[in-house]
Amino acid sequence: MALSMPLNGLKEEDKEPLIELFVKAGSDGESIGNCPFSQRLFMILWLKGVVFSVTTVDLKRKPAHLQNLAPGTHPPFITFNSEVKTDVNKIEEFLEEVLCPPKYLKLSPKHPESNTAGMDIFAKFSAYIKNSRPEANEALERGLLKTLQKLDEYLNSPLPGEIDENSMEDIKSSTRRFLDGDEMTLADCNLLPKLHIVKVVAKKYRNFDIPKGMTGIWRYLTNAYSRDEFTNTCPSDKEVEIAYSDVAKRLTK
């Protein structure tokens, strides 16, 4: 994908930075692979509205020039005006700092609680899916459900901005589209890729569905699936299943 070069004579701050994102490739070596960290950065750059290019990296056949660019580093990583950056959390902080208003959107959540909502889900899911002992399955599933319930409660609890102090009407349930409001933030870029993996993998290898009664989570996922920033940066369900084919353990007596 070609980058749009800035025109000569523009002020330095008006020039588009040269950004290339390197993400994990799928099983075919070309499509987007299963990597929530790759998707996290992909979503951030897309939401920022900045011009950037994306290169999928086949870990089985990593090209020599990429090994020289970031020796010993697996995707995701970025080059920003030819400077290599490899730490995902630091990349997120850097992009939020340099790609700032008024030219680019601010993506930090307004409510600190949005940053930690759902943070325990992936660890509980990993323990659940890697377990091979039938006698431990029920307790591990309960642990996963408990963390999902906590997220569901957060998504259904009105944020301060949804409550009108002058209104006589008591808002009992939130209708917001995402974690921090009606627009995606950095918190969504972190959680949504992981939540999607949980949904796909738990169904495939444990026949587990996120309960339909968790209306906050299902509203959240439905809204995410309606956004290009999520669906176009997301690996296919098949890629996610392939990635977990050796990780997900069969329950054996």
From Swiss-Prot:
Q: What is this protein called?
A: Chloride intracellular channel protein 4
Which residues are modified to Phosphoserine?
Answer: 4, 132, 167, 236
The species this protein belongs to is Rattus norvegicus (Rat)
InterPro entries assigned to the protein according to its UniProt record, in alphabetical order? CLIC, CLIC_N, Glutathione-S-Trfase_C-like, Glutathione-S-Trfase_C_sf, Glutathione_S-Trfase, Thioredoxin-like_sf
Its GO biological process terms?
Answer: angiogenesis; branching morphogenesis of an epithelial tube; cellular response to calcium ion; chloride transport; endothelial cell morphogenesis; fertilization; keratinocyte differentiation; multicellular organism growth
- Please name the PROSITE patterns in this protein's record: GST_CTER
The record lists the catalysed reaction(s) as: chloride(in) = chloride(out); thiocyanate(in) = thiocyanate(out); nitrate(in) = nitrate(out); iodide(out) = iodide(in)
GO molecular function annotation: chloride channel activity; oxidoreductase activity; protein-containing complex binding
Q: Where is the GST C-terminal domain?
A: 81-244
* EC assignment: 1.8.-.-
Entry's family note: Belongs to the chloride channel CLIC family.
Q: How is its activity regulated?
A: Channel activity is redox- and pH-regulated. Anion vs cation selectivity is enhanced when fully oxidized.
Protein keywords: Acetylation, Cell junction, Cell membrane, Chloride, Chloride channel, Cytoplasm, Cytoplasmic vesicle, Cytoskeleton, Endoplasmic reticulum, Ion channel, Ion transport, Membrane, Mitochondrion, Nucleus, Oxidoreductase, Phosphoprotein, Transmembrane, Transmembrane helix, Transport, Voltage-gated channel
Q: Where is this region: Required for insertion into the membrane?
A: 2-101
Motif G-site extends across 35-38
Q: Which residues carry this modification: Phosphotyrosine?
A: 244
Enzyme class, spelled out: oxidoreductase
Q: Where are the transmembrane segments?
A: 37-57
Location in or out of the cell? Cytoplasm, Cytoskeleton, Microtubule organizing center, Centrosome; Cytoplasmic vesicle membrane; Nucleus; Cell membrane
Any notes on this protein's domains? The active G-site contains a monothiol Cys-X-X-Ser motif which mediates glutathione-dependent redox catalysis.
Residues carrying N-acetylalanine: 2
**Which gene holds the coding sequence for this protein?**
Clic4
Please describe what this protein does: In the soluble state, catalyzes glutaredoxin-like thiol disulfide exchange reactions with reduced glutathione as electron donor. Can insert into membranes and form voltage-dependent multi-ion conductive channels. Membrane insertion seems to be redox-regulated and may occur only under oxidizing conditions. Has alternate cellular functions like a potential role in angiogenesis or in maintaining apical-basolateral membrane polarity during mitosis and cytokinesis. Could also promote endothelial cell proliferation and regulate endothelial morphogenesis (tubulogenesis).
